[in-house]
Amino acid sequence: MCEHNLLSSGYVAPLLNFHSPDSLYLQNLRGNGVHLSGLPQMSYSRREVCSLPWSSSNSCTAPAQSRAYSGYSQPFFSNSAAVSASLNTHKKGSLEESGRYYFQDVSHKSEEPGRPNAAYASEQSSASNGLSNLERRQLNAVAPNELSCIEQPESDASKQSVSSIAPFQPSLSAQNIRPAFTDGLPWCPSQVRSRKKRKPYTKPQLTELENEFMMNEFINRQKRKELSDRLELSDQQVKIWFQNRRMKKKRLMMREHTFTIY
């Protein structure tokens, strides 16, 4: 088997739509020189055919295939030697140009598929920088809030609970889990302070206050001060007790009044 040479005229000429010089004047002959039947005899030689002037009203343009390979149409020459020489040079030049353009295109597209372009890489870097700056600002905004929550003073009740929990080491784990649900977030204690435990009045104090209330429902500041010192109560406690007692009396009176109506 013979390999086709890419630069041979018999292989490239049909692709470029160029005819060999012999096809211009020997189209009615076979390859062995025998005349085909049914075709008129040629009464002139090869030299006369090549020397005849080419005059045609219609301009012969190369088809789209030849333009795709060469880019322009090849003019016809009167001399067969010039035609063959121009054909050979044109074949070589077109092949070199087409090969060069092909490899140039391949070199442009031979970049790695997983490698991003420069513009895309710059966009990604700018986007990542923007996200990092945003996260940094959020962290800076959250940090002072956490510090302010942590630095809040604890109430007296929490201190007492800590002091009472200290001797019992085995129950520390269970007691640490409970405040996590009641105080809110573990790193930020709840804003609501625990209410002080209500200190009940003793019986002697209640009897003394009741006697004073029977004598006078409203007391002045001086009398309230004397009661607080005598009963070992604060001025606020005495004041609140008298207010509550007056409201209680009022409710009882309203209830009796409603019963009498109905």
From Swiss-Prot:
Gene Ontology CC: nucleus
Location of this chain's protein in the cell: Nucleus
Keyword DNA-binding: yes
Domain of life: Eukaryota
Region of interest: Disordered: 107-130
Listed SMART domains: HOX
Sample GO molecular function, one term: sequence-specific double-stranded DNA binding
Segments of the chain annotated as binding DNA: 194-253
CDD domains to which the protein is assigned, alphabetical: homeodomain (cd00086)
InterPro entries in the cross-refs: HD, HD_metazoa, Homeobox_CS, Homeodomain-like_sf
Predominant location: nucleus
Keywords assigned: Developmental protein, DNA-binding, Homeobox, Nucleus, Transcription, Transcription regulation
Gene3D superfamilies per the UniProt record, alphabetical: Homeodomain-like
Known function: Sequence-specific transcription factor which is part of a developmental regulatory system that provides cells with specific positional identities on the anterior-posterior axis.
Protein family (similarity comment): Belongs to the Abd-B homeobox family.
The protein, known as: Homeobox protein Hox-D12a
Organism listed in the record: Danio rerio
Lineage of origin: Eukaryota, Metazoa, Chordata, Craniata, Vertebrata
